[in-house]
């Protein structure tokens, strides 16, 4: 028996008896004795025909010889012989039920599940029996998803004795959290943002961790039998690095409180004390954490919650720390990573500095630069960007295009293309006077086609001034913005009605569990059960990853509930104590919205890679509920949006830990510590910038630190909190209020059609993804969506279908390498040639900004109108 086979046997946790109805669970000792009595057969014992058939089952059409087999084939070859026909058929029946409407399972594979579960198998047909057993073993002991198999070894290979929560892991995590969180906070307020990503951190953690393990002495002390030491007598492991990466990564996203603090300080002139900043940040930072515990059962434990856009983190971790078979042909993952990283580190200089036309490749406008219609339709600067070859810049293409499922990317693009066509139709028919404005601008405009200056309708204390408003102008949207807002409004009711129809059983069970749990808390027994650390929440999940994770102590629900309850109490006190003019019921309303939307949004992201926030929904609802109160709107928006954003960030980390077998309690402690420390780092950066950077958040700021994100946040607070959605929906753009009804009716239509006429739709088609694609809006035209589509087609469709072996080995590693190379190159470019601007003045840098595309002129000239403006007359504005 080989080392791998012996380890697989020892680590297995469940053996199923010959009878499919009599499942017996054995201890690890029993399992070891069984396998020693019946040794696992090596792949070499199979005939060439059987091995080729196994390759065919796993879709390895690109394997041309049997001397270079993928690891999955080797693994399955040691397991197929031990499973019975009866057990295999039982697994097929469970797969048919579980993977129904699973978009990440191909129709061909699902039909195989159905065929075996309904027709059975002829025991005399050795080929069919072999295929049945291979599929069953794949489901029982590995994963049916190539994406997961590409980055995760078989779960039974896990070694739970590997140390994870070490001093050196926490030391590196704190150091990198300070640097990454501070850097990302600073550069998030720059005109062109730069952000350190987890792939960059991983790349540096590897030499730091291995060096520490090799050279730092193992000095330490014992406390009650537990050893605390600077170092341990063990190499730096992949589990340690993954633990370290995960607790750092939750601190590298958007620190949403900064929007509130900077808007209040800079635009509203408020004196914001550090106490207020800290307690508000604490609430916003941890409220999503409490909800993450609820989401675990829906988007962490289930196998179908793949989280495709997060898998490159695991791939890079394995490439750096898991040795590969030296007999495999081609580059190792380690070599491929650094080769791709070096290439992108150099290449980024061309679209970012040397040859900027590669970034905005509006080549069709170069043919006729003064053709206004050509620039409007195909341009990438001010046009809608219908261009088949729009960019060669990886910052535009993005590593997500290598990870997003093809069905998801294509469906989104179809929605984006449709909304661009609607935008063009609205513009050229002058719908709502949009022809007097640029077609695709994210600015607000006056009735004289000038950029709207929000401060002109505010009093000295930043409140809405109706007299000034009547003299100035209502705000008007460009065609692109108008269609985008309509799509946003329709998406929320569509999503709820569609998912309630398609998955009403799951949602009923989820909400029933919520309310029953809360109701049962009136009993003493419920509190005792809630505090029970031995609750086995994974017992109901039978996939191999969940069975392997059952060996670790799970975080009990009461840990998450405690965080949630404490943070809500602190939030109420903060809102009241600091006189924010925000009613407490508004806080609970925002929590309620997340209570309704959080599960479908998380499931959408976990299965398709598509994300959607609640910021616009919160803005509109709170604008109606709290008219003329922009400060309250900003606070409730921060709570309402960040609950979902933070919860998704936490549970995606939990899923990666689930894949990599990182102890849940260790991750919980690490996440809590890092999220708390991050508050001080980000607040320190924010306040330092305001006090020490001359012109920070103004057009005169050096290094382009003009805070466009804060400007947008401020504008939204005035438009939705000061002016209010009632004026916009009822009078300026009445069509927008009907988008709620349109979304609801379309949700019912598509939900019923998919539910009762599913045979007419492909399994992967999800109309919610189509609507999310329709949320494309200025300033990002179709040119930002076409290059990712082409790259996704090449990676997720062509390579995955015809070169699966190479795709599994390199795809996610290259995605991580390109991301790391891009970020580091952007940092070098900024400090070397952009902070103190240096330019190369030549055709390749100038041509994108010559001609009509750069001008952004409207179809109609407001000066040609008799009144010199459009819409209602001054003094009669809605």
Go through each PLM region and give its residues:
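Alpha-helical multipass membrane-protein architecture
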Residues: 2-878
């Amino acid at each position: 028996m080989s080392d791998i086979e012996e380890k697989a046997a020892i680590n297995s946790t469940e053996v199923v008896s010959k009878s499919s109805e009599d499942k017996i669970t054995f201890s690890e000792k029993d399992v070891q004795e069984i396998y020693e009595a019946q040794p696992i057969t090596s792949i070499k014992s199979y005939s060439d025909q059987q091995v080729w058939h196994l390759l065919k089952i796993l879709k390895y059409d690109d394997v041309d010889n049997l001397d270079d087999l993928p690891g999955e084939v080797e693994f399955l070859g040691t397991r197929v012989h031990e499973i019975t026909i009866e057990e295999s058929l039982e697994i097929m029946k469970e797969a048919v039920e579980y993977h129904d409407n699973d978009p990440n399972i191909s129709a061909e594979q699902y039909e195989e599940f159905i065929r075996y579960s309904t027709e059975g198998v002829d025991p005399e047909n050795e080929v069919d029996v072999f295929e049945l057993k291979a599929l069953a073993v794949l489901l029982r002991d590995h994963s049916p998803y190539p994406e997961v198999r590409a980055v995760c070894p078989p779960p039974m290979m896990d070694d739970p004795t590997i140390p994870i929560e070490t001093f050196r892991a926490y030391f590196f995590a704190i150091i990198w959290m300070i640097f990454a969180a501070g850097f990302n906070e600073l550069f998030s307020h720059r005109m062109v943002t730069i952000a350190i990503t987890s792939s960059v951190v991983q790349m540096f953690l590897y030499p730091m961790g291995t060096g520490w393990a090799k050279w730092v002495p193992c000095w330490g002390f014992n406390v009650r039998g537990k050893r605390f030491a600077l170092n341990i007598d063990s190499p730096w492991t992949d589990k340690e690095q993954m633990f370290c990466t995960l607790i750092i990564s939750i601190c590298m996203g958007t620190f949403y409180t900064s929007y509130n603090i900077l808007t209040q300080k800079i635009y509203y002139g408020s004196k914001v004390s550090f106490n207020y900043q800290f307690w508000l940040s604490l609430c916003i930072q941890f409220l999503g954490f409490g909800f993450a515990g609820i989401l675990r059962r829906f988007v962490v434990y289930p196998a179908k919650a793949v989280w495709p856009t997060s898998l490159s983190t695991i791939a890079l971790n394995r490439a750096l720390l898991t040795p590969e078979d030296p007999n495999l042909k081609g580059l190792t993952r380690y070599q491929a990573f650094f080769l791709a990283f070096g290439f992108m580190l150099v290449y980024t200089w061309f679209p970012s500095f040397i040859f900027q036309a590669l970034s905005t490749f509006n080549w069709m406008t170069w043919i006729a630069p003064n053709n206004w219609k050509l620039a409007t339709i195909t341009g990438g600067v001010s046009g809608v960007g219908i261009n088949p070859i729009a960019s060669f810049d990886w910052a535009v293409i993005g590593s997500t295009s290598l990870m997003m499922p093809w069905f998801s990317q294509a469906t989104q693009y179809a929605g984006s293309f449709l909304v661009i066509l609607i935008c063009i139709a609205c513009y050229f028919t002058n719908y709502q006077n949009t022809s007097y404005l640029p077609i695709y601008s994210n600015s607000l405009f006056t009735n004289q086609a000038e950029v709207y200056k929000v401060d002109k309708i505010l009093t000295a204390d930043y409140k809405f001034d109706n007299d000034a408003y009547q003299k100035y102008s209502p705000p008007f949207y460009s065609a692109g913005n108008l269609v985008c807002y309509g799509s946003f409004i329709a998406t929320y009711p569509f999503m709820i009605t569609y998912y309630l129809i398609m998955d009403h059983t799951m949602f009923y069970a989820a909400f029933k569990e919520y309310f029953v749990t809360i109701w049962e808390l009136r009993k003493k027994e419920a509190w005792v059960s809630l505090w029970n650390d031995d609750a086995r929440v994974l017992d109901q999940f039978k996939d191999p990853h969940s069975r392997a994770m059952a060996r670790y102590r799970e975080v009990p629900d009461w840990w998450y509930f405690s965080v949630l309850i404490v943070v809500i109490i602190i939030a109420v006190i903060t809102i009241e104590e600091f006189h924010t003019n925000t009613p407490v019921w508004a806080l609970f309303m925002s929590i309620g919205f997340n209570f309704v939307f959080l599960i479908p949004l998380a499931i959408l992201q976990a299965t398709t890679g598509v994300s959607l926030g609640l910021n616009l929904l919160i803005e509109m609802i709170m604008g109606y509920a709290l008219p003329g109160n922009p400060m309250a709107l900003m606070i409730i928006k921060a709570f309402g949006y960040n609950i979902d954003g933070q919860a998704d960030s936490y549970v995606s980390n939990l899923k990666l830990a689930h894949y990599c077998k990182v102890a849940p309690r260790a991750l919980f402690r690490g996440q809590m510590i890092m999220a708390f420390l991050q508050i001080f780092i980000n607040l320190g950066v924010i306040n330092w910038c305001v006090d020490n950077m001359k012109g920070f958040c103004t057009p005169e700021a050096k290094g382009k630190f003009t805070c466009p994100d804060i400007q947008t946040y401020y504008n939204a607070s005035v438009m939705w909190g000061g002016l209010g959605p009632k004026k916009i929906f009822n009078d300026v753009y009445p069509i927008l209020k009907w988008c709620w009804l349109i979304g609801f009716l379309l949700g019912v239509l598509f939900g019923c059609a998919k539910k009762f006429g599913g045979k007419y739709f492909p399994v992967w088609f999800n109309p919610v993804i189509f609507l999310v694609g329709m949320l494309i809006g200025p300033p990002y035209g179709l040119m930002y969506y076409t290059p990712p589509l082409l790259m996704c087609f090449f990676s997720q469709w062509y390579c995955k279908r015809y070169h699966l072996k190479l795709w599994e080995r390199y795809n996610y590693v290259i995605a991580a390498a390109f991301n790391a190379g891009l970020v580091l190159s952007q940092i070098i470019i900024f400090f070397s040639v952009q902070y103190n601007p240096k330019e190369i003045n030549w055709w390749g840098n100038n041509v994108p900004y010559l001609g009509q595309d750069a001008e952004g002129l409207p179809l109609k000239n407001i000066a040609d109108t008799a009144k010199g403006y459009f819409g209602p007359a001054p003094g009669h504005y809605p």
